[in-house]
Amino acid sequence: MTFHFHAFLGDIDDRLYQAEIAVTSDWHLPRRGFPATSKQMTKQSFTLDQQAESERIAKRIARAGICSRREAEARILDGRVTVNGEMISSPALNVGARDKITIDGKPLPGREPAGLWRYYKPRGLVVSDRDEQNRETIFDHLPQDLPRLMTVGRLDLDSEGLLLMTNDGDLARHLELPSTGWSRKYRVRAQGQINESQLAALADGVTIDGIRYGQVIAKLDRQMASNAWLTVAIREGKNREIRRIMEYLGHKVSRLIRISYGPFQLGDLEDGAIEQVKARVLADQLGLGDSTLEASEKPTLSINKPAYKSGAKRGRNANHSGKPSRGNPHKTGRR
């Protein structure tokens, strides 16, 4: 299957050209790269355990879509969680289906069926449920009728493209693990003339300021007078990994678009739009076979793009009527 992502990509002189990026489901990396595609790898099984009679309380909270398991443990240690009317101070507690749990005085909602969404994260939005600098976040622009969502990994303020979101904390953690074997691919605009031999050397990894970055597969797509477009694939996704590696090679990244995360593609998703992954597709990619997952197959939801341009003043109350509470994204590395 081939998806096409249409975008206007500008060079450093602001000359625009129409580009069509073909993203195929089996094009994960060039030959000199990771040894197998996701289809060739053994799928990492993910068990939902929807009918578990007893489980750790942090796991129960995460599966209710409130927050990640780690954040649930922190809330327990802060004394914000009660079980059957008693405040608990340790996450080392198993709870059953009949136990009554509250967080900050509010009853824990029933567990929703696990779902996954593809979201085109626009540039200029923070991937967080709240921002100390009062900048707008992705949650300020999500439709109100979505369930409580958290992100799978992050993208930094100036990055854009595919961001996976889920209502299940355990699923989010599972998809972030390097053991899934999934690569993340990006279209990268970098300033200057690109040395292809330097790109090839990244396949062996690189150490920058004491930080070891694993295998990076980078391919030059188009060299222009003042900048170039590349396709870059990574697996670890450390904090600002691609930007730091390109700066190490002497090139500043002026645009970064994630086009895939494992088998999930940006495809023709429009800037600011969100679309739920079909339950059977999600089940297949998680190795569940005949899935017990339930998910409504809603059409793509278009989101009002932020009505600001680079350098414009932005505020939490700009261009939206209110901020939904969606849960806390994981604090993993940004790209």
How should each PLM-predicted stretch be described?
Residues 37-335:
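Basic, flexible Lys/Arg- and Gly-enriched helix-loop patches that mediate nucleic-acid binding at interfaces
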Residues 5-7, 14:
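Short hydrophobic alpha-helical segments enriched in small aliphatic residues
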